[in-house]
């Protein structure tokens, strides 16, 4: 029996706000995505993951969902969504949609009903409403903190005008947490899954998959700041300290509780009712020893690998993450996943040093990511080698910036609209009648899709080459064939089947590759081949056919 597509897929993340704007309002839309499906298909990927496009006040760029089974007019209509799925399928691209079960928008009808209802009412029981502590109830019910900074509870004003109960929000106060111990919430979640499955969606990316279950005795936790710190990608340097910060909050009152898997067991049964190998990937940044729970045969299918995303530019550390990842998932038989960036993290070029050096490293890291067994995710613009945009504070939109009083800049720099063509903003992203929702840098002319198509040495050509080979090379198709052989210090070698090897030089000196062969793809034009000898300048790599 053929293995399901998602066990070895390449999946392209589209962030709809910033992909392509066809109606000229400065924000991307679904018809814009349809118009660029040929571009996505030409990359050689198997699927598209769409970040949320549901009705939303956009306080957290759509991760504050007011109606999980509809389309926000800024992105188009439900017919556009249907068309997008149909057109993607016509190009052999699967479609993964985002589901956001941990919380809703405060503008969802449910939350508005809860505000109009009494304490203890069924309407309030869909969320976490509690009386405050202290004689006047003016202290939050627990010491839990929000991932976005500040406290995780906000007090409401009751119908009689008096300050009343508090509600929980792990994120912004406009994102109240849903109560997943409530059967009505559970049933509604299944209805959302069925809605998109019926529409033809091939899978789901499950937002905050580790957060749905809470300890409903609502205990205080030790060191509440650790909750905020543990999830800050900008603080994670792949170190033991960073891992320990996450260990502290894993399997705690608020995160990664074992009961969360009961929800996914129900979800899995629903997905299994449908044909076509539907799948779900968990956004759950948990230590490796907790990961397998999310991808057991009766729970979800994949889990994002944030440790790989956080790995520093260091051959030993990258190797260590790869080995740990493979080991942690092997006993449940789930495929690992690999990603270098997403809409929540600094772009990989910036994370690995920025500028030309960051780009060299990022391109070499992409050779590794694309050569690994399992599934690989590519965040839009990564294939162009984009870095984070520097933005004026006045342009920022991320609630992280506002909730921390500007102490953290937030994630907007990685979310700037994609440059398609031309030499100045909006670079073909929109027709320019209205400003783009985030301003694009004025020096992106060298990074447009059009410019990179014309340059055979561009990041785009490298991504196309490796992603296409991934789909066709027998050594990459075979998921069993994978070895990490010993290599000289500062060099990483990956062996896949059928003579395919990936070699990357992490050092600041040129090295002779310990393996020779024909260069299939190089991360830089300076990689040199003389007879049997392949020379890798600093921060470069190659795929070799031996
Ligand atoms: C993770 C999403 O990727 C992020 O963008 C969002 O802010 C939080 N979850 C809350 O939904």
Q: Predicted segment positions?
A:
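Beta-strand-rich binding/interaction modules
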Residues: 509-525
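Hydrophobic residues within beta-strands of alpha/beta enzymes
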Residues: 48, 204-206
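Loop/helix patches that line or flank the sugar-binding groove of alpha-linked glycan CAZymes
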Residues: 5-7, 217-253, 262-277, 286, ...
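C-terminal beta-strand-rich structural cap/linker in extracellular carbohydrate-active enzymes
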Residues: 530-546
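Generic enzyme active-site microenvironment
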Residues: 96-97, 205, 281, 339-340, ...
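Acidic/aromatic-lined carbohydrate-recognition and catalytic surfaces
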Residues: 2-194, 198, 211-285, 418
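Catalytic cores of alpha/beta
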Residues: 291
